[in-house]
Amino acid sequence: ILSFVFACLLALSAVSAAPEPRWKVFKKIEKMGRNIRDGIVKAGPAIEVLGSAKALGK
């Protein structure tokens, strides 16, 4: 499920917005998607550490 969401965010961020003012909403959505994608990328190592710690605890 996460990989599907990540692929959608990549596709959303790859769309280039036109310089017209009515595309401002799409630029905001693109920026939000970029922030979410960056957050997922930064959280990856922490999730791996938690998973390995949980495995060691068993």
From Swiss-Prot:
Record-annotated disulphide pairs: none
A Pfam match: Cecropin
Family, per entry: Belongs to the cecropin family.
Signal peptide residues on this chain, from the entry's feature table: 1-21
Organism of derivation: Spodoptera litura (Asian cotton leafworm)
GO biological process, one term: defense response to Gram-positive bacterium
Database matches in InterPro entries: Cecropin
Subcellular location: Secreted
Induction: Induced as part of the humoral response to a bacterial invasion. Transcripts appear within the immunized fat body.
Descriptive protein name: Cecropin-B
Described function: Cecropins have lytic and antibacterial activity against several Gram-positive and Gram-negative bacteria.
Organism superkingdom: Eukaryota
Main location: secreted
